[in-house]
A protein has these predicted regions:
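Primarily secretory-pathway and cell-envelope proteins
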Residues: 1-78, 117-155
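Short secondary-structure capping micro-motifs at structural edges
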Residues: 23-27, 84-85, 99-101
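Extended, solvent-exposed segments with strong compositional bias
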Residues: 70-98
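Residues that flank catalytic or metal-binding motifs in active/ligand-binding sites
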Residues: 95, 109, 120
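Multi-bladed beta-propeller domains
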Residues: 95-102, 136-138
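Short, surface-exposed loop/turn motifs with a glycine/proline- and acidic-biased composition
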Residues: 102-109
């Protein structure tokens, strides 16, 4: 079992495609493979939520005029791309719940994620080489503000 620490970040609504940027360094690395989570909080006895989410925490790259992509000072953004989790009580302890993907066969691709539980974010990294472009965003500065798109090529 690996303990996840809460992030000090305000979570955006899940309908917002890209959150404000964070520069919090990666903390916890979990092995690639099936995952489930256990949450312990005393108030879960009386107020456990019905669901939770895993959301992608994408690394942000700048889009320069050249084809090369430069990473933007280790900036990360929470995406709206998510996996829904079920919340079920742990029979041995009423203060604990187990969080599992709706699809029991789901294996997360390598990259950084945020577990969203009770409006709190907990980040972790699934070990391995990132191959899913959803984990990389290009940021282009425009007169109307920054625009984000998935990276055409992974850095």
């Amino acid at each position: 079992m690996i303990r996840l620490e809460p992030m000090n970040i305000r979570l955006p609504d899940s309908r917002i495609a890209v959150s404000v940027l964070t520069t919090k360094p990666r903390t916890v690395v979990v092995p690639h493979g099936p995952l489930s989570f256990v949450a312990y909080q005393r108030e879960l006895m009386t107020s456990a939520p019905d669901n939770a989410q895993l959301r992608i925490l994408a690394q942000v790259a700048r889009t320069p005029s050249s084809p090369a992509v430069a990473m933007a000072n280790d900036a990360w953004a929470i995406r709206s791309v998510s996996v829904d989790l079920t919340v079920a009580p742990v029979p041995e302890s009423r203060e604990m719940v187990e969080l599992q993907p709706l699809n029991p066969d789901l294996v997360l691709s390598p990259g950084r994620y945020v577990l969203v539980f009770k409006n709190q974010a907990y980040d972790f990294v699934v070990a391995g080489k990132v191959t899913d472009r959803a984990h990389c965003l290009e940021r282009a500065e425009t007169p109307d503000g920054d625009r984000f798109t998935e990276c055409r090529n992974l850095p």
